[in-house]
């Protein structure tokens, strides 16, 4: 991880580096369960599910986290983890913990995308809905589908 001046200042003040007003980081991570795990004993698959659920619970405590099944829609992935945070370091820390966990070798990650939302320079602050557009999501929505 490279360090820029903003990150250095955040370490001095103890305040986490954040995207700034009206910006959020959005991470789309597609995973596939390894064939060896899929063909292995049911107990091993159940243990993988429990450990992954525990990691996802920790992610949800720190940032907006949703999972979506891609079974039947993509041949190269099984599920998507969608994370939204004001703090990019938080996303990186979570992914580092996943890669350091015992389940890392059981998952393949064929696709991984990072984006950043940004308030439009054309938005009208006098418009009734303007304050609600400052963040991507703050309602913790539970839509069944997410199109990437």
Region locations from a protein language model:
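Short S/T/G/P-rich N-terminal loop/turn motif that feeds into the first structured element of a domain
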Residues: 1-60, 86-90, 113-148
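Serine-centered coil/turn micro-motif
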Residues: 36, 101-102
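Short, glycine- and small/hydrophobic-rich beta-strand elements in well-ordered beta-sheets
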Residues: 56-77, 104-116
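Short gly/ser-rich anion-binding loops that grip negatively charged ligand groups
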Residues: 71, 84-85
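Short, charge-rich binding segments
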Residues: 72-73, 90, 103-105, 138-140
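Conserved, mostly hydrophobic/aromatic
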Residues: 81
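Short amphipathic alpha-helices in soluble, non-transmembrane regions
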Residues: 93-101
């Amino acid at each position: 991880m490279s360090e820029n001046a903003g990150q250095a200042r955040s370490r001095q003040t103890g305040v986490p580096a954040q995207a700034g007003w009206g910006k959020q980081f959005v991470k789309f991570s597609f995973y596939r369960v390894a064939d060896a795990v899929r063909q292995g004993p049911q107990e091993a698959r159940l243990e993988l599910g429990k450990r992954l659920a525990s990691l996802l619970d920790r992610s949800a405590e720190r940032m907006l986290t949703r999972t979506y099944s891609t079974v039947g829609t993509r041949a190269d992935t099984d599920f998507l983890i969608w994370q939204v945070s004001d703090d990019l370091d938080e996303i990186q820390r979570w992914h580092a913990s996943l890669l350091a966990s015992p389940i890392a070798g059981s998952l393949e990650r064929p696709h991984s995308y990072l984006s950043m939302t940004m308030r439009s320079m054309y938005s009208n602050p006098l418009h009734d809905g303007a304050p609600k557009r400052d963040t991507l999501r703050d309602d913790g929505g539970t839509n069944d589908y997410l199109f990437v």
